[in-house]
Amino acid sequence: MELTGLTRAAAAATVTPPAPRRGWGELRFAPLLPGERHGRRKVVVAAISEEVPRLAASPSSGIKGGGAGERRPAPEKVALRAALTVRRKQKEDIKEAVAGHLDALWDMVGRNVVLELISTKIHPRTKKPMQSGRVSIKDWCQKRGAKGDHVVYTAEFTVDADFGEPGAIAVANRHNREFFLESIVVEGGGLPCGPVHFACNSWVQSTRELPTKRVFFSNKPYLPSETPPGLRELREKELKDLRGDGTGVRKLSDRIYDYATYNDLGNPDKGKEFIRPILGGEKIPYPRRCRTGRPPTDTNMLAESRVEKPHPIYVPRDEAFEELKQGAFSSGRLRAVLHTLIPSLIASISAETHNFQGFHHIDNLYKEGLRLKLGLQEHLFQKIPLVQKIQESSEGMLRYDTPSILSKDKFAWLRDDEFARQAVAGINPVNIERLQVFPPVSKLDPAIYGPPESSITETHIAGHLNGLTVQQAMDEAKLFIVDYHDAYLPFLDRINAIDGRKAYATRTIFFLTEAGTLKPIAIELSLPPAKPGEPRPSKVLTPPYDATSNWLWMLAKAHVSSNDAGVHQLVNHWLRTHATMEPFILAAHRHMSAMHPIFKLLHPHMRYTLEINALARQSLINADGVIESCFTPGPVSGEISAAYYRNHWRFDLEGLPSDLIRRGVAVEDATQPHGVRLLIEDYPYANDGLLLWSAIRSWVESYVQLYYPDAGTVQCDLELQGWYHESIHVGHGDLRHAPWWPPLSTPVDLASILTTLVWLASAQHAALNFGQYPLGGYVPNRPPLIRRLLPDLERDAAEYAAFLADPHRFFLNAMPGVLEATKFMAVVDTLSTHSPDEEYLGEGRDEGGVPWTADEAAVAAHGMFAADVRRAEETIERRNADHGRKNRCGAGVLPYELLAPSSPPGVTCRGVPNSISI
């Protein structure tokens, strides 16, 4: 019977707690250590239901109750009520529906969901945590048919009056299948602290799958040294469970976080061409990824066997996409399949060439769709049942959306000023550097790669410097460079040996004009020396002066853009955000309790990252995956990424101000709002990025100060120190001896490290990801793959003659073919899409309707952060309307919105999610 329906007389009766059932087990806890505190700040509370009565002692207890003026004794028992919010699947297949009905039936006969409250206190006599009796949640069977995505169930506890504050709740799911528990709220008249909130957001497995109970802690944060005595051992046990023992094959229902090398990108059992080196270890240093424990391949004991689509790859259960995200990603994946399937079928049944025959054929991808543009005969098309089905059911999916790069000026991509603008306001604005040494110099071994000096001379660029000498232009910070020479040169022989792939190692020099815009003034295209130590074959091209030089200049810019696309995807996007963040996420779950205040800070910035990285290993960066098949580097893609990690990646320089200073595009200046002065004043990525960087830094510093008043509290926090130590020594273990790792000794150190991590997960990733289709979906603007070197009369006279006869066709034949282009477009369209459940920077952090923390001061600090983010967005909007900022405002010029924090769902070319979620 419902407690809320009790009469006064019944409410005065003694309530006997239910006797423990066999098999529930006993929780043992360490006693309170002398001098330890339980908490310092006010808490956020919110009632969830009608008042729950306190149950008084019975008359037989000998306690007298009384009339007017008599002091009423404290009751022996109090009633507490829990409300559990369970999220249902929006779409259930027949099997799941049947399982749901079976669970409802099992619930009626006692195989139900059982709860137990655990107090923050220990019992003075037993020295064990105070616990409630076990109770079952109500109405599971009756609410099976309830409408809505969320269902609220209730449970009622009776506890001793001195039970204290519930600090944890244990859940045993005795149904046959898992359920997603969003939150629990416990309230009652006997709680001096008010309602207690538990933000769960977790899958609770059946005890058949996982015999142990799940434990959830309240939203009140505690440093390890301040953990209430009733929760100490439980806190340690939960972390031990999450770490696992490093053995065994992981099941999809597991919650274990552990490390492994990238030894699953290749598939040697499939053939020699699918062998890939292991990334991670002394030979090829690399960050670690989440361990799955799969058995080795048959032909290489060091390589892990693969899980191929559509089978899921392991991530800890709560890291998997939630249903809204999964639905959006599946929809995007479906679109990718459709876009890729059609060209594949056409390639197999048509005798026609599959180069684009003209720019209008590329345009038709957005107008008429794949089927119509290729002129495939109708009767032949109808002979393929699957295609006919697609035609009938998904006609709209056969047509690509028009990329933003074409929306305001269809021919902008042809101009030099747009080519240069994208170096500071495009999808990869993080490689431009100030030129400080002329000619540019390579850092590669000259005994192998020849003399280090660039082939670009002052003669090449003197006429483009507005009367300045090269030295004067460098002194005035007028010369900048995008240098991919060393990133590509060691791999070019292997790349160029692949049929249909050709690349140079490129350098591009830009001049900063009086208008504040850049213009390209020289492009160097280098190939490896024929023999070690010999001079490199190089071409230097400058702005064109006639028809032939104009086409050669266009081809040179295409090679630069292709280099840029590869470095963007392999280094800046994948390595510097996705891969390098994963060890910090793994270590956070392994070493910091859910009640740790720093875990609470980082939690929204870790959402979905392990899942998207696992999907990348399965389909994107694997042997013959999307990256290898669509980008020029092909099979050496992983090695290019690893070379940057070994030679250039430094965590201490990954924060925005440090990165800008490292590249020479900014100098320290305490008089400036963000502490740096930009040498390219109209640098949209840096301008907007500094707004968000400063907002993040202020928020993190305020939050850290709430919990760490001095260096001692940082140094004595064993969970915090364990997280950072393992992130370096295991997760980034190949670079653990590097001298540049920041210390973690003071609150300032901690705030700096956390600011960098939040920046990388949110703004930096957004700037590099969500413009991929809007800015790269028109392949001639940023060809991911090039199939021809520049024509050379001495190397191939016939090819040069063909170029002169039809330069338009030569250019298009150098671009990706129809299959490569459409496959690439489909993938980056998916990667550029915001899901409906995206959580954006500065938005509310409450989880399932439950406050993310019970600390009012932390909530207030986050409110100030949200206001800072809103102001940043308003500033970005004003900048995009400022005609003085020519890199983001003007005739046909796209606004720079990649760091505008908010966004609707879909491909929007804006929006800063909290985490690396796609």
Swiss-Prot record:
Its cofactor is Fe cation. It is an enzyme of class 1 (oxidoreductase). The keyword Lipid biosynthesis applies. Binds 1 Fe cation per subunit. Iron is tightly bound. PROSITE patterns: LIPOXYGENASE_1, LIPOXYGENASE_2, LIPOXYGENASE_3, PLAT. Its EC number is 1.13.11.12. GO terms for biological process: fatty acid biosynthetic process; lipid oxidation; oxylipin biosynthetic process. Residues 56-76 are annotated as: Disordered. Keywords: Dioxygenase, Fatty acid biosynthesis, Fatty acid metabolism, Iron, Lipid biosynthesis, Lipid metabolism, Metal-binding, Oxidoreductase, Oxylipin biosynthesis. The keyword Oxidoreductase applies. It catalyses: (9Z,12Z)-octadecadienoate + O2 = (13S)-hydroperoxy-(9Z,11E)-octadecadienoate; (9Z,12Z,15Z)-octadecatrienoate + O2 = (13S)-hydroperoxy-(9Z,11E,15Z)-octadecatrienoate. Pfam families: Lipoxygenase, PLAT. Residues 90-218 form the PLAT domain. InterPro entries: LipOase, LipOase_C, LipOase_C_sf, LipOase_CS, LipOase_Fe_BS, LipOase_plant, Lipoxy_PLAT/LH2, Lipoxygenase_dom_3. This is Probable lipoxygenase 6.
